[in-house]
């Protein structure tokens, strides 16, 4: 039988799980990049949001699989007790070490230091100075870092499509076809180029390789 604290911890975990997946994994970057690519192509609802989010979730699970397995093994090798709040905090610091290393690796450390200092308020800053960040300071810093990186990637992906739009607009203007919408011509051209270059495959591989070293 689970103790009251263990039951509360279990229910809290499953309640917060969707938010942890959305903000505490690489899903946040994948979903933003995919939506920005769709917008850059000039498409509104194709692929649908559900499709893009599903692909982003599957890719995120693929990347996070070793970390999830390591956390589960630490839990099994315990034994772990969740009778008090301190037990839960202790497990988050020791049992989730692989996850903390993942967060730290892909986090802007300046943001992590800011949240660590804010968490400690005006107390001793020794842990932040020794690069020993708590899980609760790494999570917001990681989420903001992933959003920033996703916007950077989206900017570079937008550039070639903007060039195509400008070229099509200039050609239509030179031909005197000012009444025709450039989108009518540019969207099919961008689609052909994107499919011919295997855009989805290249983009997906590049995103995954930011987290996993895959031999050629």
UniProtKB/Swiss-Prot annotation:
Membrane topology classification: Multi-pass membrane protein
Record Pfam families: FliP
Any one annotated GO CC term: plasma membrane
Superkingdom field: Bacteria
Transmembrane regions listed in the UniProt entry: 8-28, 52-72, 153-173, 183-203
One annotated GO biological process: protein secretion
Keywords, alphabetical: Cell membrane, Membrane, Plasmid, Transmembrane, Transmembrane helix, Virulence
PROSITE patterns, alphabetized: FLIP_1, FLIP_2
Localization annotation: Cell membrane
Family recorded in the similarity comment: Belongs to the FliP/MopC/SpaP family.
Functional note: Required for surface presentation of invasion plasmid antigens. Could play a role in preserving the translocation competence of the ipa antigens. Required for invasion and for secretion of the three Ipa proteins.
PANTHER family attached to this UniProt entry: FLAGELLAR BIOSYNTHETIC PROTEIN FLIP (PTHR30587), SURFACE PRESENTATION OF ANTIGENS PROTEIN SPAP (PTHR30587:SF2)
Protein name per UniProt: Surface presentation of antigens protein SpaP
Native source organism of the sequence: Shigella flexneri
């Amino acid at each position: 039988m689970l103790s009251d604290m263990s039951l509360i911890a279990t229910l809290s975990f499953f309640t917060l799980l969707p938010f942890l997946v959305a903000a505490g994994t690489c899903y946040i970057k994948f979903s933003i990049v995919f939506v920005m690519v769709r917008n850059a192509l000039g498409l509104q609802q194709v692929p649908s949001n559900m499709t893009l989010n599903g692909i982003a979730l599957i890719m995120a699970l693929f990347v996070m699989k070793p970390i999830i397995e390591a956390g589960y093994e630490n839990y099994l090798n315990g034994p772990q007790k969740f009778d008090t709040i301190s037990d839960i905090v202790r497990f988050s610091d020791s049992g989730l070490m692989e996850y903390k290393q993942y967060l730290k690796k892909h986090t802007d450390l300046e943001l992590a230091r800011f949240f660590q200092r804010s968490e400690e308020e005006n107390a001793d800053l020794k842990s932040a100075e020794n690069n020993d960040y708590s899980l609760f300071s790494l999570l917001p810093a990681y989420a903001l870092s992933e959003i920033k990186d996703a916007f950077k990637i989206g900017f570079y992906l937008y550039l070639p499509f903007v060039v195509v739009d400008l070229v099509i607009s200039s050609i239509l203007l030179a031909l005197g076809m000012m009444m025709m919408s450039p989108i009518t011509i540019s969207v099919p051209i961008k689609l052909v180029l994107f499919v011919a270059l295997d855009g989805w495959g290249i983009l997906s591989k590049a995103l995954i390789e930011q987290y996993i070293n895959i031999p050629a």
